[in-house]
């Protein structure tokens, strides 16, 4: 109707609420200036003449397109608002929530033991009983039984997993299930826990015996096995005597409050109590600084320095004496050590590290070296001390006359230095 009105009218703006004649249009815009909306000719032609001359096919076509666009847009908007959109994904929220509730209740182990859940073993046994009564519906029933069987298998697997988790984290509650293997399994952990609660050696033996007595039982849960207490918690040293709950030094804050804490204390007491054999041995035997194999290499206790004493005599910033200050030792000679002036023996303490000036005249400390290191060579006897101003070359093979035989003449005169031609052999 709007398009027809636009075609019949003489002005394109008439269908939008104006009158059907140019006079009505002019009356509506009479208050406006003629130059504000329409451009006049130089000759001053009125606006009505321009409007009447502008009527043509272009204006009518544009008006028709505009009105058809508005009509289609309004209809599309109305349909979009009224028509409900289809969901691309269908979710059965009731079934999903039921699954979640069943799974959570199975994990928590709060469900009381009831009839055994249907499994894949009993579903084929039920189907042949119903097949003779309705043989004509056998094919459709078989087609519908496949998803039901898969659902029952999934439910059985979920119930088995929930039961195993409940048995793992709850040792005092029985494993739910009315089957005979489950009953045997419940009896075995009960016997193991009862024996372990005594705290003696009988509990350690009764646990495995009760677990292995039933051949048809399933795998024993981890908490029901006879495992040492150190498997679950880190062991700590005992704080007091006795094998009761107050024996081990374990705080109740680290464990659960209730029967499990008491059971843990009773299990931990015999192993880590202070009255056990290991604790008595540790308290009675002192700590040996040296290992057992090193006792063979040790000498008499008089010759060994103290544990925290300084090292032995260090003469001239050397731990070991010079080669010419140690006499050659004879392995067959074993005589008590006698010092001419020091008076040192094996059972007496060492003399001062640096002897007085009277003991070593002329700055020669040959005898002082021997006196300082005498206890470390018990098999060697000290030779008589040399004269004050004469050095002996017999202390070592490296400085003997045989090594420097070319410097001695046949008459025993030294040929070494120019000022020592008259020196005779000693």
Swiss-Prot record:
A Pfam family that the UniProt record links to this protein: TEADIR3
Stretches for region Disordered: 106-157, 226-246
Entry-linked InterPro entries: FAM181, TEADIR3_omega_loop
Compositionally biased tracts (Low complexity): 128-141
UniProt similarity note: Belongs to the FAM181 family.
Protein name (record): Protein FAM181B
Annotated organism of origin: Homo sapiens (Human)
């Amino acid at each position: 109707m709007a398009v027809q009105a636009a075609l019949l009218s003489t002005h394109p703006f008439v269908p939008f609420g104006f009158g059907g004649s140019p006079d009505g249009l002019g009356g509506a815009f009479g208050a406006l200036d003629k130059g504000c909306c329409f451009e006049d000719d130089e000759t001053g032609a009125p606006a009505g003449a321009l409007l009447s001359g502008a009527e043509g096919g272009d204006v009518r076509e544009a008006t028709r397109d505009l009105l058809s666009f508005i009509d289609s847009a309004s209809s599309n908007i109305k349909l979009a608002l009224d028509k409900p959109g289809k969901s691309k994904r269908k979710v059965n929220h009731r079934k999903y929530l039921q699954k979640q509730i069943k799974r959570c209740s199975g994990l928590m182990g709060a469900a009381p033991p009831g009839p055994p859940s249907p499994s894949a073993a009993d579903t084929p046994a039920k189907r042949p009983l119903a097949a003779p009564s309705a043989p004509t519906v056998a094919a459709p029933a078989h087609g519908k039984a496949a998803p039901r069987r898969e659902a029952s298998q999934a439910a059985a697997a979920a119930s088995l997993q929930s039961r195993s988790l409940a048995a793992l984290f709850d040792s005092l509650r029985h494993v739910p299930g009315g089957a005979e293997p489950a009953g045997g399994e419940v009896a075995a952990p009960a016997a193991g826990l009862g024996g372990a609660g005594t705290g003696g050696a009988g509990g350690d033996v009764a646990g495995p015996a009760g677990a292995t007595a039933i051949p048809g039982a399933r795998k024993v849960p981890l908490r029901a096995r006879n495992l040492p207490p150190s498997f679950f918690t880190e062991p700590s040293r005992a704080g007091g005597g006795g094998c009761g709950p107050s024996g081990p030094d374990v705080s109740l804050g680290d464990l659960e409050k209730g029967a499990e804490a008491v059971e843990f204390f009773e299990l931990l007491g015999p192993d880590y109590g202070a009255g056990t054999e290991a604790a008595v041995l540790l308290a009675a035997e002192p700590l040996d600084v040296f290992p057992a194999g090193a006792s063979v290499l040790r000498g008499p206790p008089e010759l060994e320095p103290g544990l925290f004493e300084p090292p032995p005599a260090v003469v001239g910033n050397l731990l070991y004496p010079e080669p010419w200050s140690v006499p050659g030792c004879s392995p067959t000679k074993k005589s008590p050590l006698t010092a001419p002036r020091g008076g040192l023996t094996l059972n007496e303490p060492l003399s001062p590290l640096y002897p007085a000036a009277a003991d070593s005249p002329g700055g020669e400390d040959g005898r002082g070296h021997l006196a300082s290191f005498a206890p470390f060579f018990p098999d060697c006897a000290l030779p008589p001390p040399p004269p004050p101003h004469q050095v002996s070359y017999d202390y070592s093979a490296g400085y003997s006359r045989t090594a420097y035989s070319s410097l001695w003449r046949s008459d025993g005169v030294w040929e070494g230095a120019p000022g020592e031609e008259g020196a005779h052999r000693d």
